[in-house]
A protein has these predicted regions:
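C-terminal structural segment of proteins
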Residues: 1-115
Length: 115
């Protein structure tokens, strides 16, 4: 069972960083990569109010936020045009659409999932 003592929806990245300095604190996003089992978390840190769930396109780069769902990467027209569909093709095989709607870029990178 997952037990969370305190939940904080942070107002800044600096606040999240400060809270995350404790060993028993954890940043939680979509929570789909969280392993089942017994776990005690002193502080759950929620980044959802920081606007980190966007894909921004500039002249020479894309900026992808850590809270961006994998599904958003999969269906982003500009990103797929630029990569000739490679992003879309690589993501469509990850579990199912409902899962990709919840799984975030940051969680996938942090967990080092190679797909």
């Amino acid at each position: 069972m997952l037990k969370i003592k305190s939940y904080v929806k942070v107002k800044s990245v600096a606040e999240a960083y400060e809270l995350n300095q404790k060993k028993t604190a954890i940043v939680l996003g979509g929570m789909v990569w969280l392993k089942m089992g017994n776990r005690n978390i002193s502080t759950a840190i929620d980044l959802s109010g920081l606007g980190l769930d966007t894909i921004q396109e500039f002249d020479d780069e894309f900026v992808i936020g850590c809270m961006t769902p994998l599904r958003e990467l999969e269906i982003n027209e500009s990103l797929n045009e630029y990569t000739h569909g490679a992003i879309q093709e690589s993501l469509r095989h990850i579990v199912g659409v409902q899962f990709r709607n919840c799984a975030t870029v940051g969680g996938s990178i942090w967990g080092r999932y190679g797909f």
